[in-house]
Amino acid sequence: MFFKGYVETNGKKCIEKFKNRNDFKTYEQVERLNSFAGILSKETVLVDIDDYEESEILFKIIKEKGLKCRVYKTTRGKHFLFKNNGLDKCRTHCFLAIGINADIKIGKVNSYSVLKVDGVEREIIYDNAENEEADLLPKYLTPVRSNMEFLNMEAGDG
């Protein structure tokens, strides 16, 4: 299960308290709202790629490998939802082992994913996670300590 419930937002900003709480709204209760978010379940990890080109590279890999996950189209890139493989904190502007820059959100620290903004629901463009049972986040999508821009390297660099 990707989300443990839903909360109302104002655009992308959450307007309901969601920490230390279990009485979240259902999808049916929020679907008519102008903006809402899903509270990530404990076992969910969200990989947020804001660069369109980089998000397309990862999307192609996921489709070719047939990975079980869910992918949302965003205004700038894509959100990829997987089962957490042991990450214990959220990260911003980190490099993944595959060389792509991403933000990472994890459910066990009360994170949310905006699903509808100003009346427009984010489109699910890929979802082959049966009953929302996704694959573990692949090792090549875990954060690494590096500031090298692998995608911009040429032969002989590094």
Model-derived regions: residue spans:
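Signature for HUH/AEP ssDNA processing cores
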Residues: 1-76, 85, 148-155
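DNA replication initiation modules
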Residues: 38-53, 59, 83-158
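Histidine-centered active-site/metal-ligand motif
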Residues: 79
